[in-house]
């Protein structure tokens, strides 16, 4: 298995760790995914009030969330990128990334844990909270906020 795709209130859950070089999961339209993944690269996408709860061990992890969706991650990655919009949420306080780049807009909220370098860009009433001893590059506009947990 290299990908999971759930839509229209579907639910996918697994008790075993899924191993792949590249892994992708996509949830939309109130769907739910609960999974554990070990991969070189992992792509996580959620939209339209869907939920993803994943344990991820990866070299790189990309996250996209929109339209009131919620992604919860635990595990680790050397590099993580996250783009969130439209009241979506990323809860990744238990997901440790060495390098992290986070962009939020339109009331989206992100919580991340970064150990080396963080680039945070928050706009339009969105927020980014971070933990970890990392160097930061922060941009805020139109009521966006960035702060340490």
Features from the language model and the residues they span:
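Extended, compositionally simple hydrophobic/Ser/Thr-rich segments
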Residues: 1-149
């Amino acid at each position: 298995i290299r990908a999971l795709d759930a839509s229209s209130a579907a639910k996918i859950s697994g008790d075993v760790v899924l191993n792949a070089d590249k892994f992708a999961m996509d949830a939309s339209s109130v769907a739910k995914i609960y999974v554990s993944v070990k991969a070189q690269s992992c792509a996580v996408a959620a939209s339209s009030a869907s939920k993803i709860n994943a344990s991820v061990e990866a070299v790189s992890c990309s996250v996209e969330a929109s339209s009131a969706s919620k992604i919860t991650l635990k595990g680790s990655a050397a590099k993580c990128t996250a783009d969130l919009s439209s009241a979506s949420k990323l809860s990744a306080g238990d997901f440790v990334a060495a390098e992290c780049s986070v962009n939020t807009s339109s009331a989206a909220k992100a919580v991340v844990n970064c150990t080396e370098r963080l680039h945070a860009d928050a706009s339009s009433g969105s927020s980014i909270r971070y933990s970890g001893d990392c160097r930061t590059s922060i941009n805020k506009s139109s009521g966006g906020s960035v702060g340490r947990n």
